[in-house]
């Protein structure tokens, strides 16, 4: 019997087999790669043992989905620039410069990849290529269609050779090295069997405990602020940089109401007699300010917190830069995650190396998540509100004349921040016995309140912390809210919001206790039916075309979440799958994690805080109302936090080189000064928690967040699916007819609140709409993207008339963060305004007018296009489900292959009965694959 023919993948730039390539074909492939290059690769050696090699591309730029082409370009950089320069042990990281919505963004793609073994012997090129392709494939999923403007390699080695003196390979040698790597990679990639690693014993707590820690209420803290002007650092610079010209601080005593007389201010121009250059004046001002704060702390003998409002995105970058350069004998410890600065700790270091914490810089915005002007209205309206000041027209020459006005503005900001934090701290301590100086974010505060006051970790309530494998699977079923445009234009509409959608969804039954894996949910042997499942299920889904507004989300290759009809595989919360069946979906469970279904442990938390919030609102206590609102809304998302995090350290150049070579989680390193580097390393959760013992665990329980968002989508669907629904955004709907009276209440938890009567509305894309509401004079405009200042009423009207229209605009990014140099800059950028129908397809009338949308339809695939894993799953389902075979009856290849598989199974069974092994050739090779 001849084995069935193996399918081969389509030969294109992303999927190509190399072992049979002639030199001519290979050179043609490389020629296509080189067409994208803009000039020769650049390189720089910032310090001994560190090399950066860059290859710029030109238009048309390659897409991030062109994995093979980009992997080849990375390999050329390694072969021609990195390998000739390294000595001893070496590692490297990969970077993209991506163009996302008109904004160039630098992304480090992975932690450091080893180039050599421990003894300095080079790892074979094909294995390096394999690592590169694995990394690029992961990013291709989310950035498939984004332009790659440049790639770069950062190499770290024990020693280095000047490239001017190194032995650079000739063109022919380079081609041979690259071709050899590609051919050998192709071989090992086809033959290698994936490793099924054993689960290691967990080394961290398996459930979220009650918080029983004793807490003292610190009575003193600081608030501070900086004002900046824009200045070019060098005459050759294109972009201007924010440079502090004024600063101030205030010590807040919880036993005394804030007083503007206690604010100390500093002004850069005051140092013009001792400094000639403005940058020196600014640095002198910051030195005086920080030194004064440190002296105030030392007089009291214990460390203190300094709050800046928006430290994470603005002030913190300048503070970190200043401390690094000016406090060389101190230890600086920032806590950063995804380029967000959560805190900066300043330690004094004694002669014997002991560290003593002096200051912790923290961000009040991360705790309260609202602009200062709005906080002033809620917490301290008696102070007169936030002032106004023309920041754009501040120049060095004007500083003497605007001194009084700028310091008045600065002092008002400091006074408001002090009053807000004083009041918020008092409320949280009085209500819950928690000192907010001990927490960094509002979500961390909400979790601490829940664990301290409302949670019982007994058998009926304990929330399990999934291990890495469990969390990774469940996270596939963690989707956000449902946001879609259904009809682009409507008149006389009703806009409704749900009162606290996610908190109300937290009242439903929750996945509690330890999970258990079931691998054969789709098998006839499995006695579990869908209605008995409670957990997160991988399933094969069929959504009929007649469903106009589908329920179940699906993640596309570019990361876009759509709600399609058709056939697809995904991981979903079991309750969504049950509801989908009631709508007409066909659901074929395959495998999943099953939990105990228990009454929600969040009921006391939600009901109590919501009741207190209504009471505060009725009494006009805006500050209390605000605290209750953000606390209640922030808890569910905290459980979904990714346990994978990064640690950023400021270390010596020598320590940076050691981390680059020997830390497996090394990501990147930036040189801050001649002897200091900013190093980022990725933490492995279990090892990280082991080091930190149990005092700082990552309480991540993604099953809670995924269940809450699943319940929320179920709650919204009956209203979304109405034929008169024009638009939805997570917890809101815009409809033509009023909702039933029993569904509407201005205060009831989980009910809809009528926000606006809409005279007319234009809905162009998710989070991009314009409403003319009867309750307000000006149109309500929402626009997601850099061009929001250009998105006026006229633009919406013109775009509705021609949804394919594009408009390139220039705009100013006022606060562009540059972590490589620790700067905040103002940059001129370009942005293409227009619509791109990614979530639903446009429907036009006979005159070409956009009048409606319809869901994307996916999954009417040719069997040859299915990836091997999906193919194998579907073949097994066909064996178990006759109705699914009927569904695929029009796919002759699929049914034929199923019949071959069934026939092979019969032969195998008969062979076993005869006691003879089945010959390998009797099983189709593509099924083995």
From Swiss-Prot:
The keyword Lipoprotein does not apply. GO terms for cellular component: mitochondrion. Residues 907-917 have a biased composition (Basic residues). PROSITE patterns: DNA_POLYMERASE_B. It is found in: Mitochondrion. GO terms for biological process: DNA replication. Its main location: mitochondrion. It catalyses: DNA(n) + a 2'-deoxyribonucleoside 5'-triphosphate = DNA(n+1) + diphosphate. Keywords: DNA replication, DNA-binding, DNA-directed DNA polymerase, Mitochondrion, Nucleotidyltransferase, Plasmid, Transferase. Residues 907-929 are annotated as: Disordered. Gene3D superfamilies: Palm domain of DNA polymerase (3.90.1600.10), Ribonuclease H-like superfamily/Ribonuclease H (3.30.420.10). GO terms for molecular function: DNA binding; DNA-directed DNA polymerase activity; nucleotide binding. The keyword Nucleotidyltransferase applies. Its EC number is 2.7.7.7. It comes from the Eukaryota. It holds the Pfam family DNA_pol_B_2. Coiled coil: none annotated. This DNA polymerase requires a protein as a primer. Belongs to the DNA polymerase type-B family. This is DNA polymerase.
